[in-house]
């Protein structure tokens, strides 16, 4: 499809994003019969105008910027992918580990895989996660206190951070609302959530980020950590194309669950 002006083409890009979650550079070059450089320039100009959000390899609608969604809603999204990720993460946990689980639906899937394991110590600020871990015997469980939020059924705030800083953790299972591979950032939906996550990172020897492919086509408000500063990011096969395009130094951080 050929458009006579840049303005017409960019207007059509914005229109397409109303119906599609993500527009890749390749999709734009084919649809509009333009070069990669022109497609990138269009997206950059529309990003500057606040009409879309530029992401690695394309763009998302500004309405795709993440906010907290209820756990019940998020639990059904990409369920198979989250279960596959959880299986890989469970294999990284060894007897005697102290494991801190960040509240979230992917970490909840990890808890389900670990609930019957013995000789482990668990800490979590997620109510659903703590409830899941009470299944089975032969382990220790610590529930983080603080201000309760019903949205993701978690405890957060200064009291939660103070409690977390009392521990020495072997492995942290950290959720991500989004991952910006262009800037090398792991993000979450609010400054409050980010502050709790940073407290978790401070006390943990190894940080294991869990994120399905949908987290790579979104944008979030608050930075939790840099990709280079975490141990590993476990994701699903839907991110293979994105991972192949990033620098090798960061690519080594990713483990793909099949």
From Swiss-Prot:
Residues 6-61 form the HTH deoR-type domain. Pfam families: DeoRC (PF00455), HTH_DeoR (PF08220). InterPro entries: Carb_Metab_HTH_regulators, DeoR-like_C, DeoR_HTH, NagB/RpiA_transferase-like, Tscrpt_reg_HTH_DeoR_CS, WH-like_DNA-bd_sf, WH_DNA-bd_sf. PROSITE patterns: HTH_DEOR_1 (PS00894), HTH_DEOR_2 (PS51000). Gene3D superfamilies: 3.40.50.1360, Winged helix-like DNA-binding domain superfamily/Winged helix DNA-binding domain (1.10.10.10). Represses opine catabolism and conjugal transfer of the nopaline Ti plasmid pTiC58. This is Transcriptional repressor AccR. It comes from Agrobacterium fabrum (strain C58 / ATCC 33970). The lineage of its organism: Bacteria, Pseudomonadati, Pseudomonadota, Alphaproteobacteria, Hyphomicrobiales.
């Amino acid at each position: 499809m050929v458009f006579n002006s840049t303005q017409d083409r960019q207007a059509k890009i914005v229109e397409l994003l109303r119906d599609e979650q993500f527009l890749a550079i390749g999709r734009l070059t084919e649809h509009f019969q333009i070069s990669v450089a022109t497609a990138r320039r269009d997206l950059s100009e529309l990003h500057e105008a606040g009409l879309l959000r530029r992401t690695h390899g394309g763009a998302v609608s500004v309405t795709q910027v993440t906010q907290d969604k209820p756990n019940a809603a998020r639990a059904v999204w990409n369920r198979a992918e989250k279960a596959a990720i959880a299986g890989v993460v469970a294999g990284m946990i060894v007897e005697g580990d102290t494991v801190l689980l960040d509240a979230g639906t992917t970490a909840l899937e990890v808890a389900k895989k670990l609930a019957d394991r013995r000789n482990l110590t668990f800490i979590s600020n997620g109510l659903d996660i703590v409830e899941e871990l009470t299944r089975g015997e032969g382990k220790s469980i610590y529930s983080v206190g603080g201000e309760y939020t019903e949205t993701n059924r978690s405890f957060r705030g200064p009291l939660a951070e103070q409690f977390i800083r009392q521990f020495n953790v072997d492995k942290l299972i950290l959720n991500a609302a989004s991952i910006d591979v262009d800037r090398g950032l792991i993000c979450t939906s609010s400054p409050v959530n980010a502050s709790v996550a940073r407290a978790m990172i401070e006390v943990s020897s190894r940080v294991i980020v869990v994120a399905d492919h949908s987290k790579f086509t979104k944008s979030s408000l608050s930075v939790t950590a840099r990709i280079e500063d975490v141990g590993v990011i476990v994701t699903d096969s839907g991110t293979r194309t994105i991972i192949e395009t990033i620098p090798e130094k960061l690519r080594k951080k990713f483990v793909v669950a099949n």
